[in-house]
């Protein structure tokens, strides 16, 4: 049987460039673990921080070293690697803006070649927290109270900014969390306990994104569920995250030992089933495909399960929950990567 040529795309222009490299290195290792080498040939494509694409020796060196390369010459930005023409299926491992927001998905869609993960709509809805919450509300999925804010409201007029803060005081209260709407890995998030902190947090978030979401704080356990599939997705076991910091921030996520993970989570059976059902419903609501990780708050005092967010292109690092959840569910890493590629081929197959 002829091997499928898998284009592994990683790096990118976002602040999660290094995380992308780490994830891609893990995926590449899984594709080189039996029986996958008999089925796939991996062709890595590295996107520099300035947007230049490179394949071949440079991309292989980045994977081998696990760290970014010096920026390519600006003149090479518009020269797409010739190796792209021979790819049978793309595997984008790009996190943050331009990677999981529908941008790269649109490019791959234009190539008319299958690719792993959600399409343009699912990726965009899963990236923008305001759009995501709007979809969740329409699907009847319970979530914490929130307010949306724009950069213009924060920076353009002091009177408008005061009105925004007054509204948040009244509808959300404290503590709350201020988040850029379109960044992942907890980049740019602030926990806010007072009006003064709110003003500073909004100003900070506006420097990251033109759209901002403010969410009510809640005393709850943080749990996650992985989803795998296309039209008939299935949910993994549920995992729980515990940490000593104020919230699950970037450093805690990607530093081993900073967070405690328990898989499966010690939850009542009915709560576990509810989380799994809600995870699948969220996956369908945003029109996701292939894979997603869905995060929840479990309010133990009331028995409520509140959806937090969906991540349509979760990490594949050694501390990433998505592959760990599936491993405990009986799908090891090489088998998971193999399944994701097969799902991509199935999803993009021409309709009969």
UniProtKB/Swiss-Prot annotation:
GO terms for molecular function: ATP binding; D-alanine-D-alanine ligase activity; metal ion binding. The gene is ddl. Belongs to the D-alanine--D-alanine ligase family. ATP binds at residues 169-224. Its main location: cytoplasm. It comes from Acaryochloris marina (strain MBIC 11017). Its EC number is 6.3.2.4. Gene3D superfamilies: 3.40.50.20, ATP-grasp fold, A domain, ATP-grasp fold, B domain. Keywords: ATP-binding, Cell shape, Cell wall biogenesis/degradation, Cytoplasm, Ligase, Magnesium, Manganese, Metal-binding, Nucleotide-binding, Peptidoglycan synthesis. It catalyses: 2 D-alanine + ATP = D-alanyl-D-alanine + ADP + phosphate + H(+). Pathway: Cell wall biogenesis; peptidoglycan biosynthesis. Pfam families: Dala_Dala_lig_C (PF07478), Dala_Dala_lig_N (PF01820). Binds 2 magnesium or manganese ions per subunit. This is D-alanine--D-alanine ligase. It is found in: Cytoplasm. Cell wall formation. SUPFAM superfamilies: Glutathione synthetase ATP-binding domain-like (SSF56059), PreATP-grasp domain (SSF52440). The keyword Manganese applies. GO terms for cellular component: cytosol. Its cofactor is Mg(2+); Mn(2+). Mg(2+) 2 binds at residues 309, 311.
């Amino acid at each position: 049987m002829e091997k499928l040529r898998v284009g592994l795309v990683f790096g990118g222009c976002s602040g999660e460039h290094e995380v992308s490299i780490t994830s891609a290195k893990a995926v590449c290792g899984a594709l080189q673990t039996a029986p996958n080498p008999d089925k796939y040939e991996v062709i890595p494509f590295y996107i520099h921080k300035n947007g230049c694409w490179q394949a071949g020796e440079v991309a292989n060196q980045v994977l081998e070293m696990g760290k970014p390369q010096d920026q390519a010459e600006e003149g090479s930005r518009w020269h797409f690697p010739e190796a792209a023409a021979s790819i049978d299926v793309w595997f984008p491992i790009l996190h943050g803006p331009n990677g999981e927001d529908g941008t790269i998905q649109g490019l791959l869609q234009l190539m008319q070649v299958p690719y792993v993960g959600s399409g343009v709509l699912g990726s965009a809805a899963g990236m923008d927290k305001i759009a995501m919450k709007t979809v969740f509300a329409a699907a009847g999925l319970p979530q914490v109270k929130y307010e949306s804010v724009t950069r213009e409201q924060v920076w353009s007029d002091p009177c408008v900014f005061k009105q925004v803060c007054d509204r948040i005081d009244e509808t959300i209260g404290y503590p709350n969390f201020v988040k850029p709407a379109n960044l992942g890995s907890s980049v740019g998030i602030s926990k806010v306990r007072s009006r003064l902190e709110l003003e500073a947090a909004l100003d900070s978030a506006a420097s990251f994104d033109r759209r901002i979401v403010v969410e009510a704080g809640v005393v709850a356990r943080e749990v996650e569920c992985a989803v795998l599939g296309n039209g008939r997705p299935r949910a993994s076991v549920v995992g729980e995250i515990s940490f000593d910091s104020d919230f699950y921030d970037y450093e805690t996520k990607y530093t081993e030992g900073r967070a405690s993970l328990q898989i499966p989570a010690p939850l009542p059976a009915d709560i576990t089933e509810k989380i799994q059902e809600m995870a699948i419903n969220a996956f369908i609501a945003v029109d996701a495909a292939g894979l997603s990780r869905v995060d929840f708050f479990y309010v133990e005092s009331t028995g409520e399960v509140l959806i937090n967010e969906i991540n349509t292109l979760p990490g594949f690092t050694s501390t990433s929950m998505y592959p760990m959840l599936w491993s405990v569910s009986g799908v090891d890493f090489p088998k998971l990567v193999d399944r994701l590629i097969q799902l991509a081929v199935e999803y993009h197959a021409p309709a009969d």
